[in-house]
Amino acid sequence: MTVIINGSGLTIEKVIDVARHNEKVKLHPDALKRIKTCRAMLEKKIDAHEIMYGVNTGIGEFSEVVLTDDQVKEFQKYLIYNHAAGIGDPALIEYVRGAMLGRINVHAHGNSGCRPEITLTLVEMLNKGVTPYVCQKGSVGACGDLAPMSQIALLMLGEGQAYYKGKLLDGKDAMKKAGISIPSLQARDGLSIINGSNVLTAMSAIFLYDSNNWLKQAEIAAAMSLEALKANMKPYSARLHEVRGFKGAIRSAEAIRKLVEGGDLKEERIKCKVQDAYSMRSTPQVIGTAHDALDYARSQVEIELNGVGDNPVFFPKEDLQISGANFQGSPVSLPMDMAGAAITMVSVMSERRLNRLNNPALNVGLPAFLTKGAGMFSGMMLSQYTADMQIVEQRILSAPASIQSIPAAADQEDFVSMGMNTAIKNFQILDNAYGILGIEFMAAAQALDFRDYKFGKGVKKAKEIIRKHVEFLDVDRPLYKDHTAMKELVKSCEILKEVEKIVGSLE
């Protein structure tokens, strides 16, 4: 289904549709009209020699330098050359496509002053699969994601590089093969492409989408471990969580109740302790807190997706232009720091349940390290080491980037959001989280195979899916293949999809 871009209504799910699943986009006629109206106003101001930042002045520390008419014509090209200053590995194609989509939606408001050809070229690039090559590192998150967005803007000059039909080509060749005209850059055009936190925001949208799916799988893994450990299910009572009132905890407790429905544990046919350890008893409060953190981050990201992140901002009705700081990435970077920490927190609890499954003093009659041949075999002993290493890395990465500002540009840009650092480290946190949760899934399935009572319908289905990918650990074998297979299984969301067919949505 084609995504209509009109400056509003752009959700995280629509970003996924376009960035990951290559849905087509279309600029709404009203948006195109607004872009043309704003451009007409800007050109009148240029003709009148009204001073406008980044149009007929330099940028940053050079904002007081007024450009001649001849310099205005060439300035945007050199602006993009100078700012295409990134380094390192290429950003994923879905990150770049998401950033392009976000920038089109900024332009759709009609406050950016670019020529309509610029916006329409971005639309055409998305629809024909031309994705600029963008270095992942280089942005400090203000004035927007200048370095990565400049590599997108290079395509408007027929320069840079781009992916097209699976190949990395020179920008000019990619555009030619796709049948896209190169629009060039005139006054304001270049800055209108780069002066917003669109890469940060696109990466954050994708992270939140994937993290929500990961959290739902964390609830499935928790339910499996709880059944294997004969947990007391009274702490999952709806009344208990409703009386406190946190939405995330209410949601998480409900999800886990669905997963254990129909099993002996839920029906109280198994003897349990009066009170379990926190890693078993407070799962809804902890995963629920992560849900709430992601919900807040989502609200901030979707505001940014649908707002005018630009500078200067033009108001055609009032014949007005205002220079400000609507490029500042802090409204996204701070909540996204919290979102990354939330995934780490839930990963820590997952590892604690893994410990209880392995530890013969805590695992309620299961064999030590989940092996039948203790001494000769060590079972899942080393699996915990692998999880622990990843936990420590997550903890290091959970230090907030949003407070790490370093002044630049001769102190003109003396506070920046460091939002790209947040975005990059969050995906490292999530990558580790896939592995940690995969190991808990594997251990929980192993533990359940030692139990002879009836499991909840969601738990039973999850174990069936796991056994299609990883066999029961009868005797010791190299586990790195199993760990990797489980990590990929979690990333694929196969367990989640199949379990939700049985128990319904875990949202």
What positions do the PLM features span?
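Short secondary-structure capping/junction motifs at helix and strand boundaries
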Residues: 128-136, 214
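Catalytic or ion-translocation cores adjacent to nucleophile or general acid/base/metal-coordination motifs
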Residues: 69-84, 356-368
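C-terminal auxiliary extensions adjacent to catalytic cores
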Residues: 2-23, 27-34, 38-41, 46, ...
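Well-ordered mid-protein domain cores that form the structural environment of catalytic cofactors
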Residues: 108-127, 131, 142-147, 166-186
